[in-house]
Amino acid sequence: MKTLYSLRRFYPVETLFNGTLALAGRDQETTGFAWWAGNARLINLSGKLLGAHVAHAGLIVFWAGAMNLFEVAHFVPEKPMYEQGLILLPHLATLGWGVGPGGEVIDTFPYFVSGVLHLISSAVLGFGGIYHALLGPETLEESFPFFGYVWKDRNKMTTILGIHLILLGIGAFLLVFKALYFGGVYDTWAPGGGDVRKITNLTLSPSVIFGYLLKSPFGGEGWIVSVDDLEDIIGGHVWLGSICIFGGIWHILTKPFAWARRALVWSGEAYLSYSLGALAVFGFIACCFVWFNNTAYPSEFYGPTGPEASQAQAFTFLVRDQRLGANVGSAQGPTGLGKYLMRSPTGEVIFGGETMRFWDLRAPWLEPLRGPNGLDLSRLKKDIQPWQERRSAEYMTHAPLGSLNSVGGVATEINAVNYVSPRSWLATSHFVLGFFLFVGHLWHAGRARAAAAGFEKGIDRDFEPVLSMTPLN
């Protein structure tokens, strides 16, 4: 007889396997999922699913520790971090560990400690994962009801949501405490070219913090990605941590309202799709943050942003040609606009040439040369400091371009040093992974809605090639 529905339809999500079957939850007969469907076999085995999640956390933390130690072992203190392909040490340096004025690394021991702590933690998580996957109870509902759940139990699900929110809030406050009490964090805007400092004067004004959310995402505005001082960043974490913690308490104490019970799909696959959607949003925001923001991701560690490298080149050649006698205030370029300086449509004096599109860049090496109406001609003639020239020349030659076609005027050389900026790596990886997560969100949301509506057909298995093959065993 032709099977119209996939086996999965007959294993509704609320079924509890009680562990009496030797292989319950391990084979296609008991779960409706083949071995390659991974954790789908464990949908109703809360104990085994716990093991899978703990083991996964162990793998993540093991990677963090091992990669951390690998970067420490290969680190050359005399070279900038962004020239060495590092993606973890810049994060530790940004948190103020091991660095001094100007972002110079003065002690690598904290990085070593971080790697070892992550390795030790991964061993604990790995043991827990193996224990719960192989030895622990298959389901937690009978023995440990607090940790047990049924996917349809809306009250339990929002309690779990609340616990997660509280943990996220604590994570946000860890950064706040580091910045306020435990040595401070690295501030690229500190006078004289950046330094580690404690953040004393937090921005807690809701109009400022939530004003970022109301900004346009386009040039000159830049939504939350435009944040450019640490007081706002740390103050934002106070707000976010508080909202997460109070929201978590709220979700633990309350049951979902009727409109939420009706509007949402309440199944394991639905929760998976919600989570993937959230992670996709995180990935896209992280991509924009690491690409454009040089405060949360200081250029001393991650290399310049694209706009920063382009503006640095304009500045470098302005300095050179001014020394050679050019009048940078009035020289015309090939388009009839100013060669070195021009006016933006709103009247500010900005760098001329192709870098004009990046007129809204803010960077610590450039801001001292601005006046009330943009770049100040008298400061450009008299006040340029050697450290600004050095830094802009360094950033000009380390643009995070990869092989883009439109490079904002940055001189590109096919025989140049083999260099890929960590900004390119981090922005691209987070965009690509965010996109994959978004596709996964659509896929699982569609399946969850179909299952809830009762028309999940599944694939017709009658003519599948594997049915005519010899069994593996």
UniProtKB/Swiss-Prot annotation:
Which residues are the propeptide, according to the record?
A: 1-14
Gene Ontology CC terms, in alphabetical order: chloroplast thylakoid membrane; photosystem II
Q: What does this protein do?
A: One of the components of the core complex of photosystem II (PSII). It binds chlorophyll and helps catalyze the primary light-induced photochemical processes of PSII. PSII is a light-driven water:plastoquinone oxidoreductase, using light energy to abstract electrons from H(2)O, generating O(2) and a proton gradient subsequently used for ATP formation.
Q: Does the keyword Zinc-finger apply?
A: no
Return the NCBIfam families for the record.
psbC (TIGR01153)
Report the sequence similarity comment from the record.
Belongs to the PsbB/PsbC family. PsbC subfamily.
Q: Where are the transmembrane segments?
A: 69-93, 134-155, 178-200, 255-275, 291-312, 447-471
Query: From the UniProt record, which GO molecular function terms apply?
Result: chlorophyll binding; electron transporter, transferring electrons within the cyclic electron transport pathway of photosynthesis activity; metal ion binding
Q: List the InterPro entries hit by this protein, alphabetically.
A: PS_antenna-like, PS_II_antenna-like_sf, PSII_PsbC, PSII_PsbC_sf
Q: Where in the cell is it found?
A: Plastid, Chloroplast thylakoid membrane
Q: Which UniProt keywords apply?
A: Acetylation, Chlorophyll, Chloroplast, Chromophore, Manganese, Membrane, Metal-binding, Phosphoprotein, Photosynthesis, Photosystem II, Plastid, Thylakoid, Transmembrane, Transmembrane helix
Q: Which residues bind [CaMn4O5] cluster?
A: E367
Q: Which GO terms describe its biological process?
A: photosynthetic electron transport in photosystem II
Full protein name: Photosystem II CP43 reaction center protein
One of the Pfam families matching this protein, by short name: PSII
What is the free-text note on the cofactor? Answer: Binds multiple chlorophylls and provides some of the ligands for the Ca-4Mn-5O cluster of the oxygen-evolving complex. It may also provide a ligand for a Cl- that is required for oxygen evolution. PSII binds additional chlorophylls, carotenoids and specific lipids.
Q: Which residues carry this modification: Phosphothreonine?
A: T15
Q: Which residues carry this modification: N-acetylthreonine?
A: T15
